[in-house]
């Protein structure tokens, strides 16, 4: 019998590796890979990645400028070095994240994205292998709209916890979205003090709702479930366009022979009764409807704050080496 991982791929789901630790991902044969500041920070503390930091430091020193400018340059180059190494292992695309401190600044997000794409270009990597990852705030959704429409740069809207964000992202023409699963479960468990079966899992339900909405209304934006706490959440989403999975859960799926039947089916979405909404030209309605979802508001705030904090930690490591 084939492994649960192979069965998951057979349902039509594209498997993506969620890790900066590129040494460990090859054996799972993922199509794409995702990174974020937290994953890069974790990987950068490992000895085998020291040479990537050295490259970034040398680059920043050569460019010169103030110490803060050098730190920014080193961080950008480090993100690109990780992306470059990951792209040697996978056939598809890598997601590289814009600093979360720009989550409420459309112009700064666009400029940072253009700069990252330029840095990749200097390494001989074309923009069609990169997804620029931006938090799914109103400003982030607008940045994605500009990048997709005016620059042909593909985006991954992340920290997505609600259908409101997903609708805005689809209308913006985002290439891909990352609705989070495990972090939604965390919130509900803390809030209700209940345990949830994989079928009841509110994070799983959130992704199913978004998937069905997109398929019913014919959006081409890829739905990539993210942030998993266990393999049950993953197998409940078999058939989702993409799933991005950490190496430890990929290992569990590889070592399991549990059956993985298809659970999400685009062809069944057409008959579902789902109300169509529009947000892309109505910031006030987007903000109000999003604000009505306490879980999504709290988790987006927390996610931006954590990614920003990990970027600050990464910068402090780089600053020490630049001194």
Swiss-Prot record:
SUPFAM superfamilies hit by this protein: Aldolase
One GO MF term: transaldolase activity
GO CC annotations, alphabetized: cytoplasm
Presence of keyword Cell inner membrane: no
This protein's UniProt keywords: Allergen, Pentose shunt, Schiff base, Transferase
InterPro entries documented for this protein: Aldolase_TIM, TAL/FSA, Transaldolase_1, Transaldolase_AS
Active site: 133 (schiff-base intermediate with substrate)
Gene3D superfamilies the UniProt entry points to: Aldolase class I
GO BP terms in the entry: D-xylose catabolic process to ethanol; pentose-phosphate shunt, non-oxidative branch
Pathway(s) served: Carbohydrate degradation; pentose phosphate pathway; D-glyceraldehyde 3-phosphate and beta-D-fructose 6-phosphate from D-ribose 5-phosphate and D-xylulose 5-phosphate (non-oxidative stage): step 2/3
Catalytic activity: D-sedoheptulose 7-phosphate + D-glyceraldehyde 3-phosphate = D-erythrose 4-phosphate + beta-D-fructose 6-phosphate
Entries under PROSITE patterns matching the protein: TRANSALDOLASE_1, TRANSALDOLASE_2
Taxonomy, superkingdom: Eukaryota
Entry EC number(s): 2.2.1.2
Keyword Amino-acid biosynthesis: no
Subunit details: Monomer.
Family to which this protein belongs: Belongs to the transaldolase family. Type 1 subfamily.
Protein's name according to its UniProt entry: Transaldolase
